[in-house]
Structures are given as structure tokens and as C-alpha cells.
Amino acid sequence: MKNWIFIFMISMITLPGYGKVKVQKPKMKHPTAFAILVDEVTYEKIPGAIEAYRDAIEKDGLSAYIVSGNWESPDQVRKEIVALSRRKPVLEGIVLVGDIPVAMIRNAQHLTTAFKMDEEAFPFIESSVPSDRFYDDLHLTFDFIRRDSVHPDYFYYKLREDSPQQLQPALYSGRIKYPEAKGEDKYKAIAEYLYKVVREKQETNELDCFTSFTGNAYNSECLLAWMDERLALEENFPLAWKNSRTAKFLNFRMADYMKFHLFDELQRDELDVMLFHEHGAPDQQYICEGPAPVGMNGYVKGIKAAIYNEVRKEVRKGKGTPEEIQDYFIQEYDLEKHFFDDLYHPELLKADSIANANTGIVLEDLKQMNTYPRFVMFDACYNGSFHLPGYVAGYYIFNDGKTIVAQGNSRNVLQDRWTIEMIGLLSQGIRVGQWNRLIATLEGHIIGDPTFRFSVAVPHTLALDIVKNPADRQLWEKYSRSAIPDVQSLAWRMLADQDERHELSPRLLKLFRESPCNSVRMEALKLLSRYANDDFVEAIRLGLYDAYELIRRNAAAYAGKCGDPRLIGDVVRVWLNTPESERVNDVLQSALYLFPVEKVTEELKTLQKSATTVTPFALRQRQIGEMIGKLTDKKQNRWLDYAEIPKATLSLKKQISMIRYIRNLSLIHI
């Protein structure tokens, strides 16, 4: 009885906070801690759900704080997180529940994978990045700019020039924010979601069932890129390969309107993980383009529909009157006036509307559906735009299904990013938030409970070692010999993080040469990029010929970033001889611009005369000739301009503009 009274009293103690902030100490003692940060109104409305969530987290092995307040700025929230991070036990993660201020980050586009927008030319709300790295990457420093006058929960910050310029979050984080466009009582919805999390934490559920889907126009629609994902996921999710329903790979080509097949997948109770590789918007997942044309009439109708859609789109944008837009297309494509007779025919508009609706998953679809994959990854632009009233990822967790957590992006994201890096750690019981921390980007966020994890048959201490023993070299050397590929990858990452003397690269090159595991070789290549030495150059050269398409693609990107002339011959030959690897070829073509023009041109001319290429002679001649023309044309090869940066003839403004462009450039972000 005395012990119960003591625990109750401890749970009611509040620590000094900022303003009206209240900090409830954990009820249970564990080696690491977690913080639930919630706005005052949400906590007052649903205290039972918040506390039940706290209790479930503590039963799952984390001491959990509840921090509630009338949050007036992100700085106020961050101050509380910093204070908790200095306490014991060590804080490993946080979750932001309800209406927590949104930090809109500027001067940091080099930390994004793809988002590049002129911050001087475009409005703040468009050219800033909504990012919770403000809350979990505490070594970054910012200057406050201002609060948004229309959206009072948006606060603009500039990454300081003297701040660290790389992401290294010490904590993991998640957002539990109801998408108010859904139209229900948000406090009731948050409470129901939290009780769903509590129920799911009571289940024993190993990761043994997943589906991966690739949409149209993703990765240049390269079939090799799609096929080779299996090489990695066989290593990542070893328990899933039981039958045809537990490990699925779907592609937009498999049906005229794949969204309906995906609806079936999303409502499978046994599905643990759903991976979406697609293009996206805040309110839509782009799945396919509809049925392919059949016969001559089909192609004619397809062309007509495409032109009609473009005309209507231009009119909606206010680019001109319908007549003006039609006149432009008539002249551009040599059309007859009567071509547009049916442009606004009611039946045609209705048919087009239905067809367009069937090509993507929209919020209205999700509003009527319960989703069941416990974890959903949106490898897509904008699906994780938590700062908006309606966003795709939010609709996936706020329903009566069993989806607990999603990963999504608040801005656009690079297709070539290694999105499934170390995802196999989820099979080993690592928390979803911890995995996301290891692959952090400025725009990538966890939507939902970041403490969620799958069960493991044999308990181990890996999750605890990540937090408590990151610098124990002997321990990570032991893990590097694990039979589990992504545990090996994590171990080598930890060893590289401690390699202050830069002595590890020969071992990493040996690992890259000898490992039979695709994921491990890819991690070795990525880690070697830190060293930028001869070992790295050799790994790039070997990587251009690797069996795993993703390694070839990233080796191509690294070749351009590295720019070592020794790679020119291999880059040119692979570019010319492997047209079937469409995405690799795209990256290689971009990389060619980053080498000395005269040396690339010389190599191309040598191959032009050679018979040792697989492409037909005439095609090879034309392809090489066009490439030489692009490389030597200043209008097409802007890198010829950037060679002028050190010269005093350029104005300071021009130099700064060029430097900013190069800093922000992501030929590829891995």
C-alpha cells in the first residue's frame, strides 16, 4: 500500500516549466525515457487517453513524461525538450500530440532531398520547409524570423550559418495531429487513435507480411529498379517469405485502375507493412494513368483527351480565355477549329472526371475506408504534410482500422533516395521512430506513434544499445558479424561514426567487395562516401557494375559528386552500354556534366570509333554526337559557368547565387 501511494504521489509531481507548462514525471523506471508533448486544451479534453497512452509506453519499456502547456512558440517547446534531454534516464524520443507549433525552416534546402525553391522570389509559406528536426535535432541552431500572420501556428526560422550543416538527430520524434479537413471532433479522434495504439501494444505481432507498390512515372518506370527491390526486402523482412500473400510486389501496370486493388490490400488485417513508391500531393496518391490505348481509335481518343485536359488546366490557372488557349493549341499542333467542339460537353466532362478520380487515392476515398497495415511508408512527395488541414498520412492513422504509424514527407522528396535503408531493423523490434532517426531528412516525418515496434521471437538488447552504447566499439564490432544484414549495416554505421582517425575505409571497401548482402554493400558504399579517398573511388567503379540496381544508381551519382577523372571511362561505357537500366542511365547522364568536359569528350570520341559497345552503330553515333554537343554548349551545361566562380570578374551577388545553387544541389540524396 505504501509503495502504491508513493508511486501515485511521484506521478503527480510537476517540474518547473516555462509559463504554464506542466511536466508529469514518469511512473515507471526504465533505462531510457520518452516524452509526450501535448497542448493544454487537448490534454484537458482527453486526459484519460493521454495517460493510457503513457501507461502503454511505460509497459513497453520506456519511462514516459507528459508535458502539457499553452504552447506559444516552437522555442518554448524546444526548451522543454532540451531540459528533459539533460535528465536521467536518457531521453530517446518525443511525440507531439495535438496543436503543437510548426517550425517552418529556411536557409536549409541543402538538408532536403529535392525541395529547392528561391526563398527570395517565393512567399515564405511556399519556400519554407515544415520540419520537426527543429525539435529532435538539438545540435542545430536557428534564428527566429517571424510568425505567420494568416496561419498563427506557423513560425519561420532560419538555420544559422554557424550551425552544424548536417542532420544528426539525437532523438526520434512523431506527430499525432488530426487532419481537420476530415470533419470530425478532433479531440475524440485523437483519443480513439491513442486507445487504438494502447490495444495494439498489447498484441504480439512479428513483421511477417508486407506489400510494396510502385506507381506510374516513379523511377522512370524502370522495371529493373522495381524488380531489384526484392533483392533487398528478402534480406530486410526474412519472416515474410512464406507464400504469395505475405510478400507482395505490385506495379501500376497490373490493372487499368490499380487503386481498387490497393484498397483490398489496405484492408487486409494480417498486413504489417505497406510500402508506397509513388508520386504524391498533400491530398492525393498518384497511382496510375488509366488504361493504355487500344487500336488507332484508342490512340486518337487518348491524344484528344490529353489536349482537352491541358486546355482546361490552363484555363483554370487563368492563363487566358478558353478561346485564347484553344487558339494556341490549334497553332502549336496544327489542329482544326472543330477539334474542340466537345471540350465542355457534359457527358465527356463526367467521363473524364470519373477516369481521373480512378487514377489516384484521394482523401475522400480514405475518409470512407479503414486501413490495416500497422506501418505505412509514403515514398512520395507531400503525403506527410502534417501542417495542412488535410494530408494523406493523417487519414491513414485516424480511422477504425489498425494502422498505427506512417512515414511521410512534408515537401517533395527525391525518387532516388535510399528509402528502405535499414528498414530491416523493424523486423528486429526497433521502434519506427528510431529507424526514421537513422535515415533523417529535413522533410521526412513520422505520423503517429513513433514508439511502435514489431515483436521479436528472441529478446535482445539492440534497441537499448543504440541509445545507451553508441560509442562502444567492441560491442559494435560484435554486431558487425551478425547474420542479419541490417544489423550489420547499423554496426558499420556506428563504427564509422566513431572513426575520427579515418582508418575504417579499407575495411569498408573489403566489405563492399565481399559481402553477399545487397543492403550491406549499399551501406558500405554510402559510408565510404565520408572518406572521399581512393577506396571510395574504387568502390564507385565496382558499384557501377554491381548486381543490385540501387547500388549501380547510387554509384553513378557518387561518380558525379566525386568527379574523379579516373572514373570517366567506366561512367561513359556503362551509360552507353546499359540502356535497359533507365534510372541508372538518367543519373549517369547528369554525372557526365560534372567531369572535365574535354576528358569526357575525348572518351566519347574514342568510343564513337570503337566497336566494343552493344548499341547499334548508327544509334551510338547519334547518341554520342548529341552528348558531345550538350557538354560543350553553355546553354545546356551550366557547370561551364560554375567553373568561373573563383574568378574576380564575377560580381559578388553572382558568386553567392552560384554557390547557393551548388550547396542546394542534390544530384542524389542517399
Protein language model features and the residues they cover:
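Structural detector for internal amphipathic alpha-helices that build alpha-solenoid repeat scaffolds
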Residues: 464-465, 488-500, 519-531, 552-564, ...
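Hydrophobic h-region of N-terminal signal peptides that target proteins for export
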Residues: 8-18
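Conserved small/polar residues in nucleotide/adenosyl-binding loops
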Residues: 669-670
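Structured catalytic cores of large enzymes
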Residues: 75-256, 263-273, 282-296
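Short inter-helical turns and helix N-cap capping residues of alpha-solenoid HEAT/ARM repeat scaffolds
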Residues: 483-484, 516-517, 547-548, 579-581, ...
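Caspase-like cysteine protease fold
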Residues: 419-502, 518-523
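Amphipathic alpha-helical scaffolding segments comprising HEAT/armadillo-like alpha-solenoid repeats
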Residues: 469-478, 500-512, 533-544, 564-576, ...
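Catalytic cores of nucleophile-dependent amide-cleaving enzymes
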Residues: 127-193, 305-418
